């Protein structure tokens, strides 16, 4: 009887350990899948400048420039630029932050006749965007590590022919994600945005700019633009994640 109890306890312990290990393995794989999906999502949206041309015309950014442009004494007459010029400038910023900050100092804005008016960015703005470029460089390195880990786990899971968690388990995971998003909304997206800046960027480096003093903030209507971008990246990443998991399930079913 004693031996049976000991064997049962050992068997239960092995089962619990195995179940816990599989659960942790799936959590890690799903997190890596999301990181890979976010990386792909960023790369895709960057190709179209994060929909800035559409947002400029439909999200109040053109009106923001028309109102605050005449009030900016540091970089005047930005309201005289055309929509195409603003798109060119935003594209230049997107390219620069993805290329180690190269070209930020030389960006110039022109009026409707093509006459140069002034350089776009002040020194504090250049420093901030250089910080953004440095951050992106680190995130790219992290994304490569995540991709490598994801591929290794994918191969391992395929070799062991492990099926995906049940829809109920995935739903619980999505519910957890929804709770996090809900907390962000309750606490205030703007407050969270500002707090992240304090954590991420070097102390003493300016990252908050008033519209009347910054063409960068004015043309982006910060932080509104970043909220739109966050939604686009998240939704696209979720769709890509679902596609990757569906592909995994298809590969497992054919083995």
List each model region and its residues.
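Individual transmembrane alpha-helix segments
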Residues: 91-145, 222-233
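Juxtamembrane non-transmembrane "cap" segments at the membrane-aqueous interface
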Residues: 187-211
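Juxtamembrane interface at the cytosolic side of transmembrane helices
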Residues: 16, 20, 146-193, 242-255
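Membrane-proximal low-complexity regions enriched in glycine and acidic/polar residues
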Residues: 50-57, 135-162
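Hydrophobic secretory-pathway targeting helix
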Residues: 2-52
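Juxtamembrane non-transmembrane segments of integral membrane proteins
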Residues: 38, 43-90
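Terminal transmembrane helical module of multi-pass membrane proteins
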Residues: 204-255
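Hydrophobic alpha-helical transmembrane segments
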Residues: 77-89, 114-124, 169-187
